[in-house]
From Swiss-Prot:
The keyword DNA damage does not apply. It holds the Pfam family THDPS_N_2. SUPFAM superfamilies: Trimeric LpxA-like enzymes (SSF51161). GO terms for molecular function: 2,3,4,5-tetrahydropyridine-2,6-dicarboxylate N-succinyltransferase activity; nucleotidyltransferase activity. The gene is dapD. This is 2,3,4,5-tetrahydropyridine-2,6-dicarboxylate N-succinyltransferase. InterPro entries: DapD_Trfase_Hexpep_rpt_fam, Hexapep, Hexapep_transf_CS, THP_succinylTrfase_dom1, THP_succinylTrfase_N_sf, Trimer_LpxA-like_sf. GO terms for biological process: diaminopimelate biosynthetic process; lysine biosynthetic process; lysine biosynthetic process via diaminopimelate. Substrate binds at residues 104, 141. The lineage of its organism: Bacteria, Pseudomonadati, Pseudomonadota, Gammaproteobacteria, Enterobacterales. Keywords: Acyltransferase, Amino-acid biosynthesis, Cytoplasm, Diaminopimelate biosynthesis, Lysine biosynthesis, Repeat, Transferase. PANTHER family: 2,3,4,5-TETRAHYDROPYRIDINE-2,6-DICARBOXYLATE N-SUCCINYLTRANSFERASE, MOLYBDENUM COFACTOR GUANYLYLTRANSFERASE.
Length: 274
């Protein structure tokens, strides 16, 4: 694996000079192999090690390099044709392979090669970009978008129109992460490498980036870039120091544990916030 990483790191330093016509065989094969490993879930751009999320920057570099080594080409779809550098994940799938891998794909859901989809996942008409990881039992609902290299945990529900941001540029940014057993309400956006920790519930229409204040009304604490585990979050506003205006924020209205979540429906958690 170290040899593979070295090839990617070296190629990335001269990425501006790489084209589909001049890329050498070793570099092309290394990039293609990494994309295949991401596609099968053997590698992932970020993983939790000793309780902390670690981003493997060299894998993100490989994803970026993949755009340098391929020309656009026509791709056939059920309703239309496409013209892009990145092939579709399911282009070579037959019924046996779909059954073997154990997920559902509802037309016209689109997944790019290099994204991993785990068993028992349901993809409604949605979009999953290259480098993303979608774990077991997750629902990606209609018109939801899972951005490049985003990490989606087990038993997550991404509601209709949800946007999970991609972070290939800038390269130093960490991917957006939704941990296990989270619910993200319709039309919400989580971007810029924000981490939504396990068991959290994000209400409809909540927008969270790195600069968004995440206000815990019970403690008065303000978080940036992280929604603590078990949080129930709605959109809100915080006043300026002089009280002359207010600015948008996300508000943690309560905390719940797994036992409470198992007994109480999502809608009930969001209704009882007073």
């Amino acid at each position: 694996m170290q040899q593979l990483q070295n090839v990617i790191e070296t190629a990335f330093e001269r990425r501006a000079d790489i084209t589909p016509a001049n890329v050498d065989t070793v570099t092309r094969e290394a990039i293609t192999h990494v994309i295949d490993l991401l596609d099968t879930g053997a590698l992932r751009v970020a993983e939790k090690i000793d309780g902390q999320w670690v981003t493997h920057q060299w894998l993100k570099k490989a994803v970026l390099l993949s755009f340098r080594i391929n020309d656009n080409q026509v791709m056939e779809g059920a309703e239309t044709r496409y013209y892009d550098k990145v092939p579709m994940k399911f282009a070579g799938y037959d019924e046996a392979r779909f059954q073997r891998e154990g997920f559902r794909v509802v037309p016209p859901a689109t997944v790019r090669k290099g994204a991993f989809i785990a068993r028992n996942t349901v993809l409604m008409p949605s979009y999953v970009n290259i480098g993303a990881f979608v774990d077991e039992g997750t629902m990606v609902d209609t018109w939801a978008t899972v951005g490049s290299c985003a990490q989606i945990g087990k038993n997550v529900h991404l509601s209709g129109g949800v946007g999970i941001g991609g972070v290939l540029e800038p390269l130093q940014a960490n991917p957006t992460i939704i941990e296990d057993n989270c619910f993200v309400g319709a039309r919400s956006e989580v971007v810029e490498g924000v981490i939504v920790e396990e068991g959290s519930v994000i209400s409809m229409g909540v927008f969270i980036g790195q600069s968004t204040r995440i206000y815990d009304r019970e403690t008065g604490e303000v978080h940036y870039g992280r929604v603590p585990a078990g949080s129930v979050v709605v959109s809100g506003n915080l006043p300026s120091k002089d009280g002359s205006y207010s600015l948008y924020c996300a508000v943690i209205v309560k905390k719940v544990d797994a036992k409470t979540r198992s007994k109480v429906g999502i809608n009930e958690l969001l209704r009882t916030i007073d």
